[in-house]
Amino acid sequence: MFRRKLTALEYHNPTGFDCKDETEFRNFIVWLEDQKIRHYKIEDRGNLRNIPSSDWPKYFEKYLQDVNCPFSVQERQETVDWLLGLAVRFEYGDNVEKYRNCKPVTETNDVQKSADPLINLDSNNPDFKAGVLALANLLKIQRHDDYLVMLKAIKILVQERLTPDAIAKASQAKEGLPVTLDKHILGFDTGDATLNEAAQVLRLLHIEELRELQTKINEAIVAVQAIIADPKTDHRLGKVGR
């Protein structure tokens, strides 16, 4: 809850801080006052530094009043968050020239954004939903409750079917090769040579349809694997890439 502010203040344990641990909490308050806020003079911080004292909560309550904290001692999380915010403001004020010259780290963010353009899309935007539905209908893609899933399916289909390379390969595949019916045994005889040839043609066409069906099944498996391989997919909750 407080990790970012604690990290900004260079606290020694920003990820493991537990404000519910009384000793850790008191030590943290002392550190915050000594190193960052410095509201009291050094000689006036003795009561706060006396961590084992049974009167410490009373002194802490007075400290909150002195720094004009709007929260009470009982509201510990809110108090910690407010004091951290105060400390961050003081930290910036003490080092204004240092932070003024800092350049924003935009290059890394741009690389991350370009790595997956779907990350920053608002899937609840009506225009986004309408656009995805229009594309899905145009490409005859099955509808899904999650519009991001539909968009990923569209992306996969476009990459595999509609890129210049994919179109070129598809055109080459359609050219085909001449087939000699004599090399394909029918397995039965109708008693009519013309009917035998027709049966052979139908069988070859059926085999071609089965191959196309298998190709589509393989593509569907690849598409599903691409979705479930998303590190943001939560299989337990049935949520994909959120």
Curated annotation (Swiss-Prot):
Organism domain of life: Eukaryota
Keywords of the record: Cytoplasm, Cytoskeleton, Nucleus, RNA-binding, Transcription, Transcription regulation
Cellular location(s): Nucleus; Cytoplasm, Cytosol; Cytoplasm, Perinuclear region; Cytoplasm, Cytoskeleton, Microtubule organizing center, Centrosome
Keyword Nucleus in record: yes
GO biological process terms on file: negative regulation of protein kinase activity; positive regulation of transcription by RNA polymerase II; tRNA splicing, via endonucleolytic cleavage and ligation
Pfam families: RLL
Cellular component, GO, one term: centrosome
Keyword Cytoplasm part of the UniProt annotation: yes
Family: Belongs to the RTRAF family.
Role: RNA-binding protein involved in modulation of mRNA transcription by Polymerase II. Component of the tRNA-splicing ligase complex.
Quaternary structure and interacting proteins, as annotated: Homodimer. Component of a tRNA-splicing ligase complex.
Name by which UniProt lists this protein: RNA transcription, translation and transport factor protein
Species this chain originates from: Danio rerio
Taxonomic placement: Eukaryota, Metazoa, Chordata, Craniata, Vertebrata
